[in-house]
Amino acid sequence: MVDISMADVRLLRERLGVGVMDSRNALIEAGGDIERAVEILRLKGLKSAEKREGRSVSEGLVVSRQFATHAVLAELCCETDFVAKSDRFLALSEKVADLVSDADSLETALRVRCDEGSVADLIALEAAVLGENVALRRFARVEGSRFSVYMHRTSSDLPPQVGVILAYEGHDDATARFIAQHIAFAAPEYLSVGDIPQGILQRERDLLTEISRGEGKPEEVLPQIVEGRLVKLYKQNVLLEQDYVRDNKVTISKVLEATGLRVISFARFRVGT
């Protein structure tokens, strides 16, 4: 049998975060070759991660990075809040955020190359150490030159679970910050009415038409009634149409008009939703 030193076991543990026995057994299987042992443990980690892939991931955090011409927002999920607030998971989220900072989609983010192979491989290997399913669930890239980033903790003992990136033009940074906070709490899906997909609007119109018709409303006024009822949809889902959370007497559109700001785009993630 190959003589395995505790120094090699310790080195392997430090590199991969695995247990003493797993490290020792991998070194034995590799004939004492540390790099071969690393590959053995990585392969085992990837296989064990595959077994966990179907398990629900409703906890986790959001993390962001900001640059001169773009900002990125990512949601890294796990199974329990115990893991979500662990140092190892937090370190993983920071590493992933650094690695994917130039990606333009979730697919390209997962394919970014790193020492572990790819970001997807890195996450799978860390999932094996953490003992939970871990997933990079969402990723967004927001283009622009001025950004307001807001990260919100839903509980003081947890990492940020709501994240917003707002790209804007103008110089009222304080109001931009307030609007980013508004987005975090009001959860709009679209910037303007024109951004709502026509298919969604048409389905909503058809539904409201049938509801109004069922209520006995005259056929000739149904279009006006439906358009009036669509205002509620806009208030719920369109940023520019929403009432400002700091002053519900004005809409976000009016706030922007008064301050000379223009929202270019935004991204918002809430863990598990």
Curated annotation (Swiss-Prot):
NCBIfam families: tsf. It comes from the Bacteria. PROSITE patterns: EF_TS_2. GO terms for cellular component: cytoplasm. Residues 80-83 are annotated as: Involved in Mg(2+) ion dislocation from EF-Tu. InterPro entries: EF-Ts_dimer_sf, Transl_elong_EFTs/EF1B, Transl_elong_EFTs/EF1B_dimer, Transl_elong_Ts_CS, UBA-like_sf. Associates with the EF-Tu.GDP complex and induces the exchange of GDP to GTP. It remains bound to the aminoacyl-tRNA.EF-Tu.GTP complex up to the GTP hydrolysis stage on the ribosome. Its main location: cytoplasm. PANTHER family: ELONGATION FACTOR TS (PTHR11741), ELONGATION FACTOR TS, MITOCHONDRIAL (PTHR11741:SF0). It is found in: Cytoplasm. Keywords: Cytoplasm, Elongation factor, Protein biosynthesis. GO terms for molecular function: translation elongation factor activity. This is Elongation factor Ts. Belongs to the EF-Ts family. It holds the Pfam family EF_TS.
